[in-house]
Design a protein with these regions (language model features):
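Compositionally biased, intrinsically disordered low-complexity segments
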Residues: 11-13, 45, 186
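Extended acidic/charged loop-beta regions that coordinate divalent cations
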Residues: 1-39, 83-85, 89
Length: 246
């Protein structure tokens, strides 16, 4: 159900996101909008249960303000998402690159849940750039747990933003990798080989590109300049035409 609104329920079609859309039914009990129970079908062009929840909250809010709920649901269908939120950059040789601004463990967890719904049969690879040394230190284990939902992860050097590395001499990409050693992972054999640290972002992107096979999906994740690495992993068509055939 919706967070903080137990009287509104979402019934999601688990396979729907594979088509690139999220289909669900919004159940509104009698007495909330009128005397009748309402069951409103909704289709979103953006995947993820978190997006379904956000859209449902917006639809209900609009309905409570007097907008016809079916009309509100229809308008929600036109929402194309925000830049750097599950933004598909392109596909070469059946390898797809998706960029996302997620930089907190909760965001990363939601992103990878959506990735599994959208690409249930694909290998999910992640190039993650941590944001802030302090956040990396505080949430290292939570980052590791969230990233464990991917099949293959490379953590790059930390984007410092307002902080200075000299103030955090013991914090690096390895802080997350070390924390991941105790995190269970279905694709690994308990040795943490699903995650590694490569400080140089360009090198990390090239390494991840070399691992790709057809139908793989690569996510560039973080609030820093990691977004530029999509061009490294996914060059202009023809620039590396054998991507995914290695």
């Amino acid at each position: 159900d919706l967070n903080g609104a137990a009287f509104v329920h979402i019934e999601s079609e688990s396979e729907s996101a594979q088509s690139g859309a999220e289909h669900f039914t919004l159940h509104v009990p009698a007495g909330l909008l009128d005397e009748q129970e309402r069951m409103v079908p909704v289709t979103l062009t953006v995947p993820g249960i978190h997006n379904a929840r956000n859209a449902s909250a917006a639809i209900i809010a609009a309905a409570l303000l007097g907008v016809d709920i079916e009309k509100a649901a229809e308008v929600a269908t036109s929402f194309l998402g925000a830049a750097r939120r599950f933004q598909v950059c392109g596909t070469v040789s059946q390898v797809t690159v998706v960029d996302d601004y997620a930089h907190h463990p909760t965001e990363i967890s939601a992103l990878l849940d959506a990735a599994r719904r959208r690409y249930p049969r694909s290998v999910i690879r992640v190039l993650f750039q941590p944001h802030l040394f302090s956040r990396t230190r505080t949430f290292a284990h939570e980052f590791a747990e969230a990233l464990s939902k991917a099949d293959d992860v490379i953590v790059t050097g930390i984007f410092p933003a307002r902080e200075l590395q000299r103030d955090f001499p013991d914090v690096s990409a390895m802080t997350i990798v070390d924390a991941a050693q105790d995190v269970p992972h279905a694709s690994a054999q308990g040795d943490g080989t699903w995650i590694s640290a490569v400080d140089d972002m360009q090198v990390a992107a090239q390494m991840l590109a070399m691992r790709c096979r057809p139908t793989d999906v690569v996510f560039t994740v973080g609030a820093g300049d990691i977004t530029a690495m999509g061009a490294v992993i996914l060059p202009a068509p023809g620039a590396r035409h054998n991507l995914g055939d290695r």
